Amino acid sequence: MTEAKKSLKRTLVGKVVSDKREKTVTVLVERRVKHPIYDKIVIKSSKYHAHDENSEYKLGDTIEITESRPLSKTKNWVATRLVQKAALV
């Protein structure tokens, strides 16, 4: 029996907060959690460094990132698709 293994890689959606490094973007991912004692919805956030091969994502873009093998000391994610382009001000 040869079955194709289904990939269980995590995907997250976040906003690009930095695109200063070459082929790398910093993505801020926010999530809503309920506080265990006070029952209030609290917004928690994490920053991830994601690989951007063609440097196509810019500051303010909302993108989807997928977990991958370690690409450097801090980079374990790859930018996969653009969800929403940044609004021009």
From Swiss-Prot:
**Which PROSITE patterns does the entry mention?**
RIBOSOMAL_S17
Q: What Pfam family does this protein match (any one)? A: Ribosomal_S17
The record's listing under SUPFAM superfamilies reads: Nucleic acid-binding proteins
InterPro entries linked to this entry: NA-bd_OB-fold, Ribosomal_uS17, Ribosomal_uS17_bact/chlr, Ribosomal_uS17_CS
Task: Tell me the first and last residues of the signal peptide.
Answer: none
GO cellular component, alphabetical, reads:
cytosolic small ribosomal subunit
Query: Mind listing the GO biological process terms from this record?
Result: translation
Q: Answer whether the UniProt record assigns the keyword Cell inner membrane to this protein.
A: no
Coiled coil (UniProt feature): none
- Gene Ontology MF: a single term: structural constituent of ribosome
Key words, A-Z:
Ribonucleoprotein, Ribosomal protein, RNA-binding, rRNA-binding
| Function, in words | One of the primary rRNA binding proteins, it binds specifically to the 5'-end of 16S ribosomal RNA.
**How is the subunit organization of this protein annotated in UniProt?**
Part of the 30S ribosomal subunit.
Q: Spell out the PANTHER family in the cross-references.
A: 40S RIBOSOMAL PROTEIN S11 FAMILY MEMBER (PTHR10744), SMALL RIBOSOMAL SUBUNIT PROTEIN US17M (PTHR10744:SF1)
Q: What is this protein called?
A: Small ribosomal subunit protein uS17
Q: What is the lineage of its organism?
A: Bacteria, Pseudomonadati, Pseudomonadota, Betaproteobacteria, Burkholderiales
Which gene codes for it? rpsQ
